[in-house]
Amino acid sequence: MAITIPNREEILADWEAHPMRKPRIEKVTINIGVGESGERLTKAEIMLERLTGQKPIRRKAKKTNRDFGIRRGEPIAVKVTLRGPKAYEMLKRLLAAVDNRLKASSFDEHGNVCFGIDEHINIPGVEYDPEIGIFGMDVCVTLERPGFRVARRKRKRAKIPTRHKLTKEEGMVYMMEEFGVEIVEEEG
């Protein structure tokens, strides 16, 4: 069942009156956790590069886990970070893979959203390649307001005031308005 945000009209009116308060996409991070190094990790890297047109980086294990046969420092995942118009276009394709539906629990308290894709072949425009196989992936969308640079810059760095931080509801409204996403409650 789709969720309705009670103060949606207030949020939209605020963005209309104050354009600098309207959120935007800072980055889209796509991660494929393979759990092992070797041929399967290389195939995931090739697939992610074909999908995004950008060279992915390898992520290393932080701890040794004997049960999974993982050593500390061993590459076990690949990820790519997209920014700007490239991130926007890729997010449209990735949301189509999940039927433009997101769970309310996928949003954190700062309006960011993460969701998973079970099989990469569900993404529009992606063909199945038997040499590579099928991979699932995690997609994290980081939202920000204009002016968040003051927290990241080197000189004259400042904290973002609470009134300028994004809320969970604003993140939901942004995804609904910008991408036509339907936000659903938990099933079960």
Curated annotation (Swiss-Prot):
Pfam families per record: Ribosomal_L5, Ribosomal_L5_C
Transmembrane feature ranges: none
Leader sequence residues: none
GO-annotated cellular components: ribonucleoprotein complex; ribosome
Function (record text): This is one of the proteins that bind and probably mediate the attachment of the 5S RNA into the large ribosomal subunit, where it forms part of the central protuberance. In the 70S ribosome it contacts protein S13 of the 30S subunit (bridge B1b), connecting the 2 subunits; this bridge is implicated in subunit movement. May contact the P site tRNA; the 5S rRNA and some of its associated proteins might help stabilize positioning of ribosome-bound tRNAs.
The family this protein is said to belong to: Belongs to the universal ribosomal protein uL5 family.
Protein name: Large ribosomal subunit protein uL5
